[in-house]
């Protein structure tokens, strides 16, 4: 790895950047929850989005503990308890995504439709995005995939720090290149 690539990775992988992207994901998730519930009345997508946003909050908690360096006080059982439930829920999210996409395709659900739009008569017979209202499994499936993203990210994170704790017990020190410890 060249020095230029290393510098770019340190910028992109810096803990503050990770926290920023996670907060963006949480805000986006909350806005999607409100949109699916209030405007589209798509309750399966609302529930799936809420679950994904909760796992994004778990990611924020992990990153915040890493930034504040309190993660070094966690027991290895804490990390072990995080790995398998996150992997299992991620698999359920992936399975849910596939099932939703298959059912949505078989039942000919659309993610957005321009049927009913008439430019010549200057009128709209149906809403331009009529397929987005009510239950739509394309959105539910997409947010199921987001659940997989957050849960597997949390599982890999927990596994990484479980391994660091294991090597730290042998070496006597935990060293993380991604975090600056700020002493007051």
UniProtKB/Swiss-Prot annotation:
The gene is hrg-4. Disruption phenotype: RNAi-mediated knockdown results in the heme accumulation in the intestine under low heme conditions. Simultaneous RNAi-mediated knockdown with hrg-7 results in defective heme deficiency sensing. It comes from Caenorhabditis elegans. Belongs to the HRG family. Its main location: membrane. It comes from the Eukaryota. One of its GO terms (cellular component) is plasma membrane. Induction: By heme deficiency. The lineage of its organism: Eukaryota, Metazoa, Ecdysozoa, Nematoda, Chromadorea. One of its GO terms (biological process) is heme transport. Keywords: Cell membrane, Glycoprotein, Membrane, Transmembrane, Transmembrane helix, Transport. The chain crosses the membrane at residues 19-39, 46-66, 87-107, 124-146. The keyword Membrane applies. Pfam families: HRG (PF16954). Glycans are attached at residue 42. Heme transporter that mediates heme uptake across the plasma membrane. It is a multi-pass membrane protein. The keyword Glycoprotein applies. InterPro entries: HRG. It is found in: Cell membrane. One of its GO terms (molecular function) is heme transmembrane transporter activity. This is Heme transporter hrg-4.
């Amino acid at each position: 790895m060249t020095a230029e690539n290393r510098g770019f990775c340190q910028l992109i992988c810096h803990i503050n950047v990770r926290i920023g992207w996670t907060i963006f994901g949480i805000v986006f998730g909350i806005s999607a929850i409100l949109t699916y519930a209030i405007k589209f009345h798509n309750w399966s997508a609302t529930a799936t989005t809420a679950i994904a946003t909760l796992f994004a909050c778990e990611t924020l908690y992990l990153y915040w503990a890493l930034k504040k360096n309190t993660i070094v006080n966690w027991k290895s059982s804490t990390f072990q308890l995080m790995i398998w439930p996150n992997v299992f829920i991620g698999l359920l999210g992936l399975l849910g995504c596939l099932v939703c996409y298959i059912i949505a395709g078989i039942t000919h659900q659309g993610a957005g439709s321009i049927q009913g739009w008439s430019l010549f008569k200057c009128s709209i017979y149906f809403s331009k995005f009529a397929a987005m209202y009510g239950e739509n499994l394309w959105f539910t499936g997409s947010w199921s995939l987001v659940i997989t993203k957050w849960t597997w990210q949390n599982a890999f994170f927990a596994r990484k720090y479980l391994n660091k704790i294991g090597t730290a017990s042998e070496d006597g020190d935990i060293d993380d290149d991604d975090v600056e410890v700020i002493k007051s």
